[in-house]
Design a protein with these regions (language model features):
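An N-terminally biased module of ancient metal coordination in phosphate/nucleic-acid-related enzymes
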Residues: 1-60
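Active-site gating/metal-coordination segments in enzymes
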Residues: 53-54, 62-121
Length: 121
């Protein structure tokens, strides 16, 4: 079984405008990436073409840099519902952007997120 352990599938609507523009400039295949971010089915087909069985989808809270709030956790929880055996969710908690770490962790668990990335302070 082949598992890609580091894929960023992100909510495009959360990107700060300047971060999104930079991504568009630096990624010649931006439209393909955007389609994968919008459509789990399209991303699963791409995994099939590449011979990848599963993918860990990593998001992270980074409001200052990219614009991502803790809403990325809900986004990825919803995204992986398309095929939870192949799409493995990795949520995020940023110590500087929470007032209650325990409550945020409990919410991540309620969403069914299977892994967590703790962004450094």
């Amino acid at each position: 079984m082949i598992t890609d352990c580091h894929i960023h599938i992100s909510p495009l609507e959360m990107f700060k405008p300047q971060a999104l523009e930079l991504m568009k400039k630096k990624r010649p295949n931006f439209e393909q990436i955007a389609e994968f971010c919008r459509s789990p089915k399209a991303f699963l087909k791409y995994l099939d073409v590449c011979g990848i069985d599963r993918a860990v989808l990593i998001n992270y809270v980074a409001p200052e840099v990219i614009g991502f709030t803790n809403g990325v956790n809900q986004f990825i929880a919803d995204y992986v519902k398309e095929d939870p055996k192949r799409l493995l969710s990795c949520g995020s908690l940023h110590p500087r952007h929470t007032t209650n770490v325990l409550a945020d962790m409990e919410q991540i668990l309620r969403l069914g997120i299977r892994m967590i990335k703790i962004h450094p302070p």
